[in-house]
């Protein structure tokens, strides 16, 4: 009303480049077909394989770091939480520790349940560390990098990871929201979103808006060069 702000609409990409095609994969149907819980759908695995065969690059996005997002006793149901702030502890494979992402508290993972003394401890949930591990297993010949706040703590590590990806030394980049914005790599023709539901479950009344914004941003990393892009979004 006061003319202080103007609405600017971006109706197309620069140089009239095509927007990437977006495909939604219902992982519940995947579970029903394959009879097991899988990190990647057959659609995403096939897309990654085709991308690598063409000599192009892929970005795999999951906005959750760590290996297992919680560990639980299958006997009594106990979920291990931070002793300081009661936040669920996340297991990090490289450090071999449980870490609180809120206050930084760490502890060794228990061999038996501290409550019922059962040895039936399960590592559950999914983070970028596990995604990287699984992709390395599925595509052993591919060069893979992971970019999150765990891999970018050292000086120069951020530029090193992006430099290798830009040069083509790395063919698959796994990461959190750090890779969702501002990256322009013309050879990236595929973006895979492992679990689009992660940010929807955050206790914030704007979680749906933030999820849409994040998905829109990461989808924009695909097809920024001469070749058309594809985005595969896995959801439950």
Language model features with spans:
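Inter-lobe coupling/hinge segments of SF2-like helicase ATPases
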Residues: 1-236
């Amino acid at each position: 009303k006061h003319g202080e702000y103007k609405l600017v609409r971006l109706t197309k990409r620069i140089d009239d480049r095509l927007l990437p095609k977006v495909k939604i994969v219902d992982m519940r149907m995947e579970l029903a077909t394959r009879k097991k819980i899988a990190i990647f759908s057959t659609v995403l695995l096939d897309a990654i394989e085709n991308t690598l065969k063409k000599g192009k690059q892929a970005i795999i996005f999951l906005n959750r770091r760590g290996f297992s997002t919680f560990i639980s006793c299958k006997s009594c149901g106990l979920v291990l939480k931070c002793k300081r702030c009661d936040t669920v502890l996340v297991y990090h494979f490289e450090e071999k520790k449980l870490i609180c992402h809120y206050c930084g508290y760490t502890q060794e993972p228990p061999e038996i349940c501290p409550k019922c003394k059962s040895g039936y401890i399960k590592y559950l949930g999914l983070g970028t560390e596990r995604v990287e591990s699984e992709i390395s297993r599925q595509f052993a010949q591919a060069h893979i990098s992971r970019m999150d706040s765990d891999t970018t703590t050292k000086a120069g590590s951020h530029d090193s990871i992006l430099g290798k990806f830009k040069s083509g030394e790395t063919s698959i980049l796994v990461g959190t929201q750090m890779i969702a914005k501002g990256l322009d790599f013309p050879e990236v023709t595929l973006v895979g979103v492992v679990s689009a539901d992660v940010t929807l479950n955050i206790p914030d009344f704007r979680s749906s808006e933030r999820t849409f914004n994040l998905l829109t941003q990461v989808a924009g990393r695909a097809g920024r060069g001469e070749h058309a892009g594809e985005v595969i979004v896995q959801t439950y």
